[in-house]
């Protein structure tokens, strides 16, 4: 229903993805290569096909019903006026009864009742089973939603449908930290497992509770830049990225986070549109601009997460009809745009900018049929630019985005720079210069300047005396460039970057 986020069996591999034997082989082969495998952990909700929920439906007053949130309706209406993340009411009527069950996502994804201790213990047993197999950790999905306000109060409607966003109920709940600590102590902590939380709706003052030495997780994703294009009502009124706000937001997050620990830095993921289309101005949506965006992201303080296709510069697809989409959220946003008075063309354009399916089109391996992804029919169509943007072509081109990413990551992890880029401070620079994204990475031994021109005009940068040599620049991406720099200023053309020591 939701591309794998509706779990019907927590102890099995979905048939379309392979077998448990193949997964065990993956773990073994990864270990030989000193690599680690983490998996998605979806424990806010399960599938309506799960054995627990099927038993709950048969007896809405029985033991398994308490694994979920079954509530009586009010005056013939649902228990409260929450809108699910995918649109429509959060409450689904149980046929033949006066009860409803809660689903903050799709109706096929009933929320699990984390107030039930027996359920929690079953989840902990399942998590430890995977860790015992040799898994190194988890990306933990939608985890802050596990704590509900059990009064389920109504909120002021925020749209024409008379409903209120369900996250308002989550924000009104208290005590999620206690549940997360119990989760950690019963599972991850025992195995020294790596965890990265997908956390929205966290209060800023709660950051030290979520990351750092004693945090609930090893790290959490930094979604601060993604939130800049959140519309008040949906995708149809999502604002375009403003460079000054983007720069201020990212650097501000860096300064706040370093007080407590590390965040996981992203440009894109499976729930977001492609970063090259979202964050780069039109004049920079090219290989040079994509390398520039990758540079300023990968060299930030924190853990860089590189999503499939990002390393070759994949972009948003061109969608001709709402029927071409598979994503449930996209179809809901299309309906919301139409309901708000937009034309079909305008609604489709809004989805084209923001749809999650932009990041879910098949990986572009080659210029062969289906971009070399499969000989079968893929879930989604292939981006029509696959003949120009694909792995096979970029493998052969030393100046490609792919080979640049390899060089960038290798330098970040090199013996010379790994301490600096792991633990060094991030200090904003040239914040008053139009179009310039710049910062220093600094520790007791080294100081590196990263500077990029996102503008459409050349910019003059006045350098301080600490800049001695250029390590990498737009013009020098094939070899390690270690040449002396003796000039007091730097002339940076549009869509260019430098990395200086």
Predicted features, each with a name:
Residues 48-81, 180, 184-362, 367:
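Conserved alpha/beta catalytic core and glycan-binding cleft of carbohydrate-active enzymes
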Residues 24, 29-30, 303-306, 312, ...:
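Carbohydrate-interacting/catalytic domains
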Residues 138-140:
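Hydrophobic residues within beta-strands of alpha/beta enzymes
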């Amino acid at each position: 229903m939701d591309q794998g986020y509706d779990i019907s069996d927590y102890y099995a591999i979905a048939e379309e993805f392979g077998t448990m034997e193949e997964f065990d082989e993956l773990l073994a082969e990864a270990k030989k290569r000193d690599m680690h495998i983490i998996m998605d952990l979806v424990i806010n909700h399960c599938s309506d096909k799960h054995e627990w929920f099927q038993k709950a439906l048969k007896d809405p007053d029985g033991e398994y019903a308490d694994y979920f949130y079954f509530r009586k309706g009010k005056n013939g209406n649902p228990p409260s006026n929450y809108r699910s993340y995918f649109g429509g009411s959060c409450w689904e009527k149980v046929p033949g009864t006066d009860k409803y069950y809660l689903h903050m996502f799709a109706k096929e994804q009933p929320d699990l009742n984390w107030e039930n201790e027996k359920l929690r213990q079953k989840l902990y047993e399942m998590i430890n089973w995977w860790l015992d197999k040799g898994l190194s950790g988890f990306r933990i999905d939608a985890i802050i939603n596990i704590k509900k306000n059990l009064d389920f109060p109504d909120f002021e409607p925020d749209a024409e449908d008379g409903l209120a966003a369900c996250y308002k109920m989550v924000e009104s709940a208290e005590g999620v930290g206690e549940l997360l600590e119990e989760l950690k102590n019963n599972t991850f902590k025992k195995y020294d497992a790596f965890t990265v939380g997908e956390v929205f709706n966290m209060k800023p003052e709660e950051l030290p509770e979520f990351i750092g030495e004693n945090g609930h997780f090893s790290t959490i994703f930094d979604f601060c830049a993604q939130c800049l294009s959140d519309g008040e009502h949906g995708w149809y009124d999502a604002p375009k990225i403003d460079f000054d706000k983007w720069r201020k937001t990212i650097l501000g997050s860096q300064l706040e986070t370093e007080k407590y620990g590390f965040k996981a830095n992203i440009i894109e993921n499976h729930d977001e549109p492609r970063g090259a289309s979202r964050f780069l101005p039109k004049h920079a949506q090219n290989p040079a601009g994509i390398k520039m965006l990758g540079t300023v992201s990968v060299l930030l303080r924190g853990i860089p997460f590189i999503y499939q296709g990002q390393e070759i510069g994949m972009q948003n697809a061109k969608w001709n009809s709402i029927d071409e989409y598979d994503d449930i959220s996209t179809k809901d946003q299309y309906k919301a745009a139409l309901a708000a008075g937009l034309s079909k063309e305008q609604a489709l354009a809004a989805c084209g900018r923001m749809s999650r399916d932009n990041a879910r089109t098949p990986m572009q391996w080659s210029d062969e049929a289906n971009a070399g992804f499969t000989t079968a029919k893929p879930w989604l169509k292939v981006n029509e630019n696959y003949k120009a943007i694909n792995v096979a072509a970029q493998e052969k081109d030393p100046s490609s985005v792919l080979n640049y990413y390899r060089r960038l990551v290798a330098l970040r992890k090199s013996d010379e720079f790994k301490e600096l880029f792991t633990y060094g401070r991030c200090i904003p620079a040239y914040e008053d210069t139009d179009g310039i994204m710049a910062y220093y990475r600094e520790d007791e031994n080294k100081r590196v300047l990263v500077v990029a021109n996102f503008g459409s005009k050349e910019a003059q940068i006045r350098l301080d005396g600490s800049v001695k040599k250029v390590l990498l620049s737009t013009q020098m991406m094939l070899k390690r460039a270690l040449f002396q720099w003796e000039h007091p200023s730097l002339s940076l053309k549009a869509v260019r970057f430098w990395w200086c020591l």
